[in-house]
Amino acid sequence: MKNQSSTITTQPARPAVISGTPEGSGPGRLEVNVIFTDPQATVAALKAAGALARDLGACIQVRAAIPVPYTLPLEKPPVSVGFLQSLLYRLVSRSDLHTFEPSVHLYICRDRIETLVRVLGPNSLVVISGREHWWPSAERRIAKALRSKGHRVVFVGLKRDAKSDLR
């Protein structure tokens, strides 16, 4: 079967881009994994992750799994990789989390949940944010899927009329 994802990793302090295949992180320092959903929700998740990382002495990993429809080749996602990289870099830079050595991992994939399950280490600490609704949102479905695979998931709910910190 053909490879269904590709990886790009960015260190905000040193904007180098590394491409490769997704793989889980090795042993070492505790990681708080922030899942990119949308810019406003990711800012809220980064704030919560900063508090967790401070209390746990952990580093922060921002993971963005961007699904590409089967009608498009994997090498040509609907949103340019350069745009996604700059968006993620700006989000992390504005979050004032440099003391936690945040790094950004961009995965271009077919299935977002499958990719996240594959790249997260066992029993990972995950922070994800999304709008509060009475129906299950995409963010809630991701959180539920990651919990079912044994990860510890913190869901940061956003109010519907929440103001954005993005400017």
Task: Give residue spans per PLM region.
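Active-site-adjacent beta-strand anchor residues
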Residues: 35, 106, 136
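Small/aliphatic-rich secondary-structure junction motif
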Residues: 23-75, 145-151, 155-160
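Glycine-rich, N-terminal phosphate-binding loop of Rossmann-like dinucleotide-binding domains
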Residues: 36, 130-131
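A glycine-rich helix N-cap at a beta->alpha junction
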Residues: 80-105
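Structural beta-alpha unit
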Residues: 1-25, 97-126, 132-133, 141-153, ...
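Short, well-ordered secondary-structure micro-motifs
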Residues: 45, 72-75, 115-117, 138-139, ...
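Residue-level marker for well-ordered alpha-helical positions
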Residues: 47, 89, 137-141
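Acidic, proline/glycine-rich short linear motifs
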Residues: 3-4, 8, 12, 62-87, ...
